[in-house]
Amino acid sequence: MARNGEGSVRPQARLLVAKGSFSVMGGGERDIIRNLPALSKKFKVTVATLDSSNELDSLCEEYGLDLMKPDVRWTPPKGPISRILDRGFSSSLESWKSIEGLVEILGDLDYLHLTSGDGSLSILEIIPARISVHLHLLEPHRGLHEDVLHRMVDGSPRRNLSLTRAALSMARRKDLSKMRRVSSRDRTAISGNSEFTSSRIEDVYGISSGVLPPSLDPEEFPSSRLEDESSSLFEIDSPYVVTIGRASWAKGTWEAISMLRGTGFSLALVGGGEDESIDSLIEHAKSCQVGLWVAPRLDSSDLCSLVKGAVAVISMAHSEPFGLTPIEAQSLGTPALFVDEGGFRETISDGVSGRLLPRDDYSAWHEALAEAGEADNRSSWSKNGRANIANMGLNPEVFSKRLEEIFLSLE
């Protein structure tokens, strides 16, 4: 297993940037799109995906990057039988093979930067052995190795968890086998997106990995951005806090509403969710007398306006791989109040650049909300957070340099 190296990649080495799906446009997808312009300065970049997004289409057109995708958009097979039999791997492989010209360009390729997710790993079946591969493993397969994704938005099991785990045993064994096969491939490096993720990769798969953190574009989240009348613009009852991520138990959405009971704060949820989950959250918010506003997705400009107008950005997510949302909040000058778990510990210093709080101590959260409203705290936490972002090198240029060094270490 190779780790970061030293040196300089030869001019315009040919890099394929690939991910199975971009349609969700979560943190992982935003990070890739954010890094593509910087990567295109170091490499001759081609992008490939089975399920593109408008944001990816627009950026590739703007920067003149070749974007390769199938004529028919791929989506993961639905249903328990498909998950048990791992049909997504075979169907995604066929979709990769169907992309016009993809197999042909592999002969001229130098490097593959592959980001994990639905449909991603199967592309390795058609990658020649001579090509250096970097797998950015954002998290082990949570649906196979944890139970948080098998719970309803309120935390209740979708079905018996023991039976679910037993039913997924074949898919789990296949996942372990695939990851160990990737780790033993020559000219291959695996990186988590945080020290926490790297430790989880070791725990779940028994393989070592490096760390390649995501990045933040200062122009996308500028500290000097003017505040808009966000509550009026988005019709949210003020004061409000923001939580980002598709509504689920894993993202802690239900718990965030429970915590806000009695505070007078509304919750703006960015990320949407299944209709059943949103309906349940609406009823839960009513019972807690918490205002709830939901947006499936916002562009960067609207998201910045929403966050700037908030008292705080909060999250009670379970074992989040990397704390990207906190640094976005810090960049915009909005306090970050997050559960003291997972990757959040790597981007928030408690009481210095935000707050890390015990999940079940709601009184501590309420005190933190009061602290977040104080001008001195908002100023100092944001200043310290931005300094930490700079110290960690969380920007597209440093990301590109780190990826370059990883590939050089494989030669």
Task: Give each language-model segment a name.
Residues 93, 360, 376-408:
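A charged, aromatic-enriched C-terminal amphipathic alpha-helix characteristic of glycosyltransferases
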Residues 49-54, 244, 266-281, 296:
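Glycosyltransferase donor-sugar binding loop
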Residues 30-34, 239, 246-262, 276:
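A conserved mid-protein helix/loop that constitutes part of the nucleotide-sugar donor-binding site
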Residues 335-339:
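Short hydrophobic beta-strand element within catalytic cores of glycosyltransferases
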Residues 279-301:
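Nucleotide-activated donor-binding/catalytic signature segment of Leloir-type glycosyltransferases, i.e.
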